[in-house]
């Protein structure tokens, strides 16, 4: 099971697997990005805020969260954006598991630029 490293949320190394995400309170949302690249999707996953609450944290506790993919793509999200937007760690799109071009997790941020929708997520760095 693929592991997503969660850097900076505890003194010890932290990570979450897709299996662990699926065991959490999952949601399915229908949304689209504000750019034309992706269109409307029905995404299934968990909110990053729910993962953080397991550590007693909230998105707004951080000045920056940077999401990295295995392809070395990264998308930094800053405090104001983090306070105003929900971030989903999606493991399914349109009722299907993610394909290998997106797995293990894809970021979905409703009504935001698709540039933030990082694919193949393997690491999330949290900075206070």
Ranges and model annotations:
Residues 1-128:
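N-terminal intrinsically disordered, low-complexity segments enriched in P/E/S/T
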């Amino acid at each position: 099971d693929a592991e997503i490293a969660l850097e900076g949320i505890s003194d010890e190394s932290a990570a979450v697997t897709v299996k662990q995400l699926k065991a959490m309170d999952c949601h399915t949302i229908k949304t689209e990005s504000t750019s034309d690249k992706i269109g409307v999707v029905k995404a299934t996953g968990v909110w990053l805020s729910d993962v953080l609450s397991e550590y007693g944290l909230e998105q707004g506790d951080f000045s920056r969260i940077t999401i990295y993919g295995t392809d070395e793509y990264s998308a930094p999200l800053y405090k104001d954006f983090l306070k105003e937007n929900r971030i989903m760690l999606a493991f399914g799109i349109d009722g299907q598991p993610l394909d290998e071009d997106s797995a293990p997790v894809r970021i979905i941020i409703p009504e935001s630029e698709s540039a933030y929708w990082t694919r193949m997520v393997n690491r999330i760095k949290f900075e206070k």
